[in-house]
């Protein structure tokens, strides 16, 4: 109810703006997920259909110095009540001056350069019910001040209002086993979700290199999942600890080579670790005398916890191919394989996109999981190989 009232209030504020000064765009998508095996938990559904909408409103004045943006999102899912959800991705006011910028409200901030995972991207919470690749994020309340100088840009954040990570429900698929029970969520801070987090980032372009140094203090976006009893069932209970995280991201462009690195040091009272992802992408331009480009992607994924890591990517290699046709339909595809160095566990993923006409877009995603080792985090998805087909209308 609270979220519905907030969405309604935001909508009323937006429609009160002069119609001629507001620009609208957005998309409506239909999505089908096809699973190739019976679920590991008989309560989980099989193939699944859903519909989603994400309109976007933008209004600026004072010669573009001030602006307001509003991006709500909603999905109606056939099988998982937790995936049927709504969120305000963005509802913010921005003020742009010569040497500084303000953003106040609900917004999204992206940090990161690597392909396989984004370790430094900590401002927004992951909307995990949308996709297990952790690319989709929830809107985060914030006040952001950007100081623009010759020696770089400094972004300062005050982050009130913590967002809990979304997880698939009892019928949801793919999901971990045992499932996560959000009603059992606990916090290290006595303020729980009201703890005010702080963050800062310095970024700069130095020749062919883009570099970012970041710091975060507050409630971890990644919960510790502890076994617990819930209505006679073994589940996982999320625990959100207070952390300090320092991070670095670097991208170096040299001709056809693109070198990338992300690394973090996370310090908490309950869990401490170091993680890093680094590698390169080499692009073959105009393959076979065509307009198409083919990129070779290789990355190494490291976690100091080793086999004790709660992520499947603690000592793994990513090998991938990125095909970009550079045609009128903006056709592209990315095939990737993440392989564990200690056993035969791996994850294969495929993403492909193609525009149809001026307003339609077809997207295909496929994932295959193989867990022959001791990695329980990947074994949870062993029966959840799937093909996802999505058709979107963009206006």
Label each PLM-derived region with a short phrase.
Residues 22, 57-61, 94-97, 106, ...:
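Residue-level signature of outer-membrane beta-barrel architecture
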Residues 26-28, 68-72, 104, 145, ...:
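Membrane-embedded beta-strand positions of outer-membrane beta-barrel proteins
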Residues 45-51, 84-89, 137-141, 148, ...:
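Residues that define the transmembrane beta-barrel architecture of outer-membrane proteins
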Residues 58, 64-174, 207, 371:
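Outer membrane beta-barrel
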Residues 63-68, 99-102, 151-154, 208-211, ...:
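Repeated loop/turn-to-beta-strand initiation elements of outer-membrane beta-barrel proteins
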Residues 145, 280, 381-395:
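Outer-membrane beta-barrel "beta-signal"
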């Amino acid at each position: 109810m609270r979220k519905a009232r907030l969405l309604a209030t935001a909508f009323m504020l937006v429609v009160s703006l002069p119609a001629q000064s507001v620009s609208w765009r957005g998309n409506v998508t239909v999505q089908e997920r096809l699973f190739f095996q019976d679920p590991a938990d008989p309560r989980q559904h099989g193939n699944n259909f859903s519909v989603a909408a994400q309109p976007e409103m933008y209004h600026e004045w004072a010669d573009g110095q001030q602006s307001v943006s509003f991006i709500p999102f909603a999905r109606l899912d056939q099988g998982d009540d937790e995936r049927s959800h709504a969120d305000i991705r963005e509802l913010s006011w921005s003020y742009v001056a010569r040497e500084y910028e303000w953003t106040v409200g609900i917004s999204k901030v992206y940090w990161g350069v690597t392909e396989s995972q984004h370790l430094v991207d900590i401002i927004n919470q992951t909307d995990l019910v949308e996709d297990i690749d952790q690319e989709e994020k929830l809107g985060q309340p914030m006040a952001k001040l950007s100081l623009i100088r010759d020696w770089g840009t400094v972004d300062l954040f005050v982050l009130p209002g913590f967002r809990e990570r979304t997880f698939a429900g009892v019928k949801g698929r793919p999901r971990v086993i045992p499932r996560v029970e959000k009603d059992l969520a606990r916090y290290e801070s006595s303020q729980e979700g009201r703890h005010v987090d702080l963050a800062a980032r310095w970024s700069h372009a130095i020749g062919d290199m883009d570099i970012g140094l970041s710091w975060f203090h507050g409630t971890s976006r990644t919960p510790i999942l502890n076994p617990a009893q819930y209505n006679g069932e073994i589940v996982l209970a999320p625990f959100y600890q207070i952390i300090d995280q320092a991070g670095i991201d670097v991208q170096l462009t040299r001709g056809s080579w693109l070198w990338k690195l992300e690394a973090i040091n996370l310090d908490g009272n309950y869990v401490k670790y170091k993680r890093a992802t680094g590698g390169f992408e080499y692009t073959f331009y105009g393959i076979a005398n065509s307009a198409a480009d083919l990129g070779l992607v290789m990355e190494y994924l490291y976690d100091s916890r080793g086999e004790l890591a709660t992520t499947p990517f603690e000592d793994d290699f990513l090998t991938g191919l990125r095909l970009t046709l550079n045609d009128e339909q903006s056709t592209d595809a990315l095939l990737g394989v993440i392989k564990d160095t200690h056993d035969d566990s791996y994850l294969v993923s495929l993403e492909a996109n193609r525009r149809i006409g001026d307003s339609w877009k077809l997207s295909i995603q496929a994932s295959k999981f193989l867990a022959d080792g001791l990695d329980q985090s990947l074994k949870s998805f062993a029966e959840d190989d799937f093909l996802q087909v999505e058709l979107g209308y963009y206006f």
